[in-house]
């Protein structure tokens, strides 16, 4: 197998059912998400700002190219999973930035998941309508 000469760091982020793999390599700021342009996959500005916030905090907005692969979940779960993956990739690249990223909550994995449905209930906690007679 041929070793690549490009220095790249790869990290994974998860949120609910969304799993995001982020490849960070030196470049000009080009971002590719599942083969689409960044603003095509994430049309809302707030989503793009949330994902790029770890880069903005460290001041590396135009220094890296990102290749992002996302599976599962909804849009918001994918956004948070990608942000976590990006923060972890930046941490691999530069270990000095851990305190800055951790204090802003970028390295924290949100453990909440969908609660399972219980038998005898309509949903996880919602019951069927009660009838006294």
Swiss-Prot record:
It comes from the Bacteria. Keywords: Ribonucleoprotein, Ribosomal protein. GO terms for molecular function: RNA binding; structural constituent of ribosome. Residues 114-133 have a biased composition (Basic residues). GO terms for cellular component: cytosolic small ribosomal subunit. Residues 95-133 are annotated as: Disordered. GO terms for biological process: translation. InterPro entries: Ribosomal_Su5_D2-typ_SF, Ribosomal_uS9, Ribosomal_uS9_bac/plastid, Ribosomal_uS9_CS, Ribsml_uS5_D2-typ_fold_subgr. Residues 95-113 have a biased composition (Basic and acidic residues). Belongs to the universal ribosomal protein uS9 family. HAMAP family: Ribosomal_uS9_B. This is Small ribosomal subunit protein uS9. It comes from Chlamydia felis (strain Fe/C-56) (Chlamydophila felis). The gene is rpsI.
